[in-house]
UniProtKB/Swiss-Prot annotation:
GO cellular component terms listed in the entry, alphabetical order: mitochondrial matrix
Organism, as annotated: Mesocricetus auratus (Golden hamster)
Domain of life (superkingdom): Eukaryota
Protein known as: Pyruvate dehydrogenase protein X component, mitochondrial
Function recorded in the entry: Required for anchoring dihydrolipoamide dehydrogenase (E3) to the dihydrolipoamide transacetylase (E2) core of the pyruvate dehydrogenase complexes of eukaryotes. This specific binding is essential for a functional PDH complex.
Family the entry assigns: Belongs to the 2-oxoacid dehydrogenase family.
Limits of the Peripheral subunit-binding (PSBD) domain: 2-27
Residue ranges, annotated region (Disordered): 1-27
């Protein structure tokens, strides 16, 4: 998906955070 580097970095951080609890992610 297309997002600015900053937004993508935040989303990735949230994705990693969510991965610890659930196996679902925006990727």
């Amino acid at each position: 998906f297309r997002l600015s580097p900053a937004a993508r970095n935040i989303l990735e951080k949230h994705s990693l955070d969510a991965s610890q609890g659930t196996a679902t992610g925006p990727r």
